[in-house]
Regions:
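Small-residue-biased structural context
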Residues: 1-158
Length: 158
C-alpha cells in the first residue's frame, strides 16, 4: 500500500488507508500495547525489572513513538485526500519502528518475562489478556481484522 501511495497509483483508496490506520489502532494500541502496559510491565516491575533506563522504559518509548506515527498517518488523510509524503514518511518510519520493537520483544522482553515471572503469574497474565481481547476488543474482531488483511494482500501484494 505504501508503495502505491508513494507512486501515486490510483488504486490506493483513502478508505483503505483509513482502514489500515483503524487496524493499527485496534490491534496494536488497544490490544497489544494495553496487554503490555497494563499487565506485563507492572508484573515485570514487581519482579524487579527497571522501568526507567531499562527494557520497560525502552518499550514504552517505542509505544509512544508508534502512537505518534499512527497519528501522523491519520492526519495525512483529510477530506478524502491523501498527503502522500506525510503518509509515506510516517508509514515507513512505523514499519521500521515495528520491526525493531518486535525484535526487542522476541530477543529480550519475552525471554526476560519467561525467566522472571512464575508459571502461575504467566497463567494469570494470559487470563487477563484473554479477558481484554473478549471484553475490550470484542468477539469476532480478530476475524474481522484478518479479513481486512487478506483483502489488502490481494489488492496490494500482487
Amino acid at each position: 500500500m505504501c508503495v502505491n501511495v508513494q507512486n501515486n497509483k490510483k488504486q490506493t483508496d483513502y478508505k483503505d488507508i483509513e482502514d489500515i490506520i483503524g487496524f493499527l489502532k485496534v490491534l496494536t494500541d488497544k490490544c497489544h500495547h494495553v496487554k503490555e502496559e497494563d499487565f506485563l510491565f507492572p508484573a515485570l516491575e514487581k519482579a524487579g525489572i527497571k522501568n526507567e533506563n531499562g527494557p520497560i522504559g525502552v518499550m514504552l518509548s517505542q509505544h509512544k513513538q508508534g502512537r505518534e506515527l499512527i497519528k501522523q498517518m491519520q492526519e495525512s488523510v483529510v477530506n478524502k485526500m491523501i498527503n502522500r509524503n506525510t503518509f509515506v514518511d510516517a508509514a515507513s518510519s512505523y514499519v521500521n519502528l515495528l520491526r525493531n520493537h518486535i525484535e526487542k520483544e522476541d530477543t529480550l522482553l519475552f525471554p526476560l518475562s519467561d525467566t522472571k515471572l512464575s508459571a502461575s503469574k504467566q497463567k494469570e497474565l494470559l487470563k487477563n489478556f484473554e479477558n481484554l481481547e473478549k471484553n475490550v476488543i470484542g468477539e469476532g474482531k480478530y476475524e474481522e481484522l484478518y479479513i481486512l488483511l487478506v483483502k489488502f494482500k490481494g489488492k496490494y501484494l500482487k
